[in-house]
Amino acid sequence: MSLCELAASGSSLLWPRVLLFGDSITQFSFQQGGWGTLLADRLVRKCDVLNRGFSGYNTRWAKIILPRIIRKGAGLENPVAVTIFFGANDSTLKDENPKQHVPLDEYSANLRDMVQYLRSVDIPKERVILITPPPLCEAAWEKECILKGCKLNRLNVAVGEYAKACLQVARDCGTDVLDLWTLMQKDNQDFSSYLSDGLHLSPLGNEFLFFHLWPLLDKKVSSLPRLLPDWKDVEETKPELSLLGDGDH
């Protein structure tokens, strides 16, 4: 069969999508050993993992761009799961970083608005995972700030308030949530090894996030089939019998 004949006889393959929406911790997640890369590897031939991370962004800006990323009427192209991972920038100290700072009440409202928007475009709450910001290692981050010629512009206690707000939004909206801020500090452990500069994730921190996120995500994608048959199961003499239409799975 020619390629044109094959195109006419086979149904289109719809590749399910997992959307990662967040700030720099999401943007950097596709670096070597990043948590997004680990997810993509785990979901090979089941889902495409899309990185929609925007370094430096807060929920005020995220709320504006979300409708440009996921449009109403996408139907079958809608993600099977969405992570919303903001707060590291919203929680900056207003006096030191007014551009990125978002007041706590507005942060909560923005998260809630984004979950409600997803519902309005047929992505139900069961597909959504909120992720709290990780804890801040102030000593390490202060060194980074000094190198940039500024004062310490974040405090872990403030980040914790935003993490609590994220948890409350998840409870109110009925979404899953990963409380990264609490988990990384469980039993008063030294969490500095999870962070590369006091704020962003180290290789160990990426593994930690993946390990705790996967069970939540797996619930949403476990029923999805592996796309196309294993090579050992492809019909040898007439491969199109295996590779077109109902043989996709």
From Swiss-Prot:
This is Isoamyl acetate-hydrolyzing esterase 1 homolog. Keywords: Hydrolase, Lipid degradation, Lipid metabolism. It comes from the Eukaryota. It comes from Rattus norvegicus (Rat). The modification N6-succinyllysine is found at residue 63. The record marks 56, 89 as: Transition state stabilizer. One of its GO terms (molecular function) is identical protein binding. Probable lipase. Belongs to the 'GDSL' lipolytic enzyme family. IAH1 subfamily. Coiled coil: none annotated. It is an enzyme of class 3 (hydrolase). GO terms for biological process: gene expression; lipid catabolic process. It holds the Pfam family Lipase_GDSL. The active site is at 24 (nucleophile), 197 (proton donor), 200 (proton acceptor). Its EC number is 3.1.-.-.
